[in-house]
Amino acid sequence: FRPREASGLVELTLPTLGFAGHDLPAGGGGFFRLLPYAASRWAIERVNRVEGRASIFYVHPWELDPGQPRFAGLPARSRLRHYLNLGRTAPRLRRLLRDFRWDRIAAVHAAEIAAPGALPAWSPADPATRRPGR
């Protein structure tokens, strides 16, 4: 994690997978769907074991819906990026949930989030902390 002194926000980074001199995202999303399951598993294990910290993972809801509408006329690259392996995402996610222990970010990273100045105080009921125009 990296605290952002000026803003008070806390950045919790996603795991990456080093490949051919590049850091590829390995914390979920399209890369979880497009890359082999072993790539995500390896990246998460590395974060847990080598870096000694909990990994963060996310999935887009649409990536769990193989029956989503298909749009005609999309370029091949877009079709691959959006539709490839849609039917595999839910089974992979179930496997990932079995293979590792998971919890909410607020529970796993409570110390970092609670650090003085880590996050600005906010309340939907407090006009002083409400965003302008809301």
Regions found by a protein language model. Name each.
Residues 1-58:
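Active-site-adjacent pocket scaffolds in enzyme catalytic domains
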Residues 35-134:
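C-terminal domain-boundary segment and adjacent tail
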